[in-house]
Regions:
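N-terminal Rossmann-like FAD-binding beta1-loop-alpha1 element of flavoenzymes
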Residues: 4-28
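Helix-loop-beta segment of a Rossmann-like dinucleotide-binding subdomain
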Residues: 83-94, 108, 121-124, 128-162
């Protein structure tokens, strides 16, 4: 019997299991097939904590807090597993490639800049300079300097290795089709 069962061994499930294992709970992860081979395996590695927000919310605040943890998480995983997730605080450029995207990106800029004054609108010259000429001018662009990226494949491998080192039980090739809830008193 386990204290906690986590369904899904993508990066979210493995991260939760890794964190909970430090509390001395008996944690196990169930996966329908091979761990880390779906969305986690295909991810590009962009953290994008601010990328989709146009207003303040609990989720926005959680995303910002999560992003702030990546430098230490990267070091912790490297120390524990020897796998470098290649965290880079490289910033993020968001571009409006179509005229219809201009109002959306400007609304997002207004919100993000109100939360972080380092978020800037980019002129065509700014965009060319920031990307060393690799990105052509667009309808509108913003720069989010405090965002970052990781190597998603290395992140998945590091979390998987961490689970092994922590003896977190994994049930692979096990599909959960329903959950039965029962209450017992200790």
């Amino acid at each position: 019997m386990h204290d906690v069962l986590i369904i899904g061994s993508g990066v979210i499930g493995m991260s939760i299991a890794r964190h909970l294992s430090a509390t001395h709970l008996d944690v196990a992860v169930i996966d329908r097939d091979v761990p880390g081979k779906h969305a986690s395996y295909k991810a590009g590695g962009m953290l994008g904590a601010q990328n989709e927000f146009t207003e303040d919310s609990d989720l926005f605040q959680l995303a910002i807090e999560s992003r702030a943890m990546f430098p230490q998480l990267s070091k912790s995983l490297l120390d524990e597993t020897g796998i470098d997730i290649q965290f880079k605080n490289s910033g993020l450029i968001k571009i409006a490639n179509e005229h219809d995207d201009i109002s959306s990106i400007k609304r997002q800029y207004q919100f993000l800049n109100s939360q972080d004054r380092s978020v800037k609108q980019l002129s065509d010259d700014d965009l060319l300079q920031l990307t060393h000429g690799e990105v052509k001018p667009s309808y509108a662009a913003i720069h989010i300097p405090h965002d970052g990226q990781i190597n998603a494949h290395h992140y998945t491998l590091a979390l998987l290795e961490s689970m092994k080192l922590r003896d977190i039980k994994r049930y692979a090739s096990t599909e959960v089709t329903s959950i039965a809830v029962s209450y017992t008193h200790l």
